[in-house]
């Protein structure tokens, strides 16, 4: 029996530790002050911006309106030389660009950035042809409008002048044969003891 008895049940410290570890999560769930933070008090900011114009610039940058609309990194953040970027008389520059683009060139108001984006001429996918039967040459669809008779490889020609009877009546002297299941059910009902 050596090694099977650990005396843990007699160790008060170990028992308290086990109890604390098993009950603390429930106490946290039941605690009414678990979302209260003592540092969560309205305090004035120590750093103040010198002018409200910087706040507008920061907000414009956070909204992304000071960048041109492109997902290409080189178009969003183009490389500008010392004399600024592309000039406004460049034919690649759109006539209605964001006014923030004019701030990127560092040599005057005429220095702007272009994304060199081109107008797409194709949507990027092709739709299937809606006239799928147009180019068929089998018996079903080949010259279907011009042929007077309906033809098919497994059917014979049906003349248009022949009339097919729509209703056929059962003569009164012949009885209608009931299905076998109905006959068995009827026999079982008749053979029941009352």
From Swiss-Prot:
Task: List, alphabetically, the GO terms of the cellular component aspect.
Answer: virion component
Keywords recorded for this protein, A-Z = Virion
Cell compartments where the protein resides: Virion
Domain of life here? Viruses
Main site of residence? virion
Q: Which family does it belong to?
A: Belongs to the mimivirus R457/R459 family.
- Protein name as it appears in the record: Uncharacterized protein R459
Q: Which organism is it from?
A: Acanthamoeba polyphaga mimivirus
């Amino acid at each position: 029996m050596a090694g099977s008895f650990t005396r843990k049940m007699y160790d008060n410290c170990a028992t308290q530790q086990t109890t604390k570890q098993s009950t603390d999560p429930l106490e946290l769930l039941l605690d009414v002050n678990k979302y209260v933070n003592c540092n969560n008090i309205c305090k004035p900011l120590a750093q103040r911006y010198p002018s409200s114009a910087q706040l507008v610039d920061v907000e414009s940058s956070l909204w992304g309106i000071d960048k041109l609309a492109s997902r290409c990194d080189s178009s969003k953040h183009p490389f500008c030389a010392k004399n600024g970027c592309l000039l406004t008389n460049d034919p690649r520059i759109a006539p209605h660009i964001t006014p923030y683009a004019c701030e990127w060139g560092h040599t005057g108001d005429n220095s702007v950035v272009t994304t060199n984006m081109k107008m797409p001429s194709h949507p990027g996918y092709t739709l299937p042809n809606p006239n799928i039967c147009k180019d068929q040459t089998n018996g079903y669809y080949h010259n279907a409008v011009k042929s007077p008779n309906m033809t098919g490889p497994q059917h014979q020609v049906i003349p248009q002048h022949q009339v097919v009877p729509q209703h056929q009546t059962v003569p009164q002297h012949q009885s209608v044969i009931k299905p076998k299941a109905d006959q068995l059910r009827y026999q079982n009902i008749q053979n029941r003891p009352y």
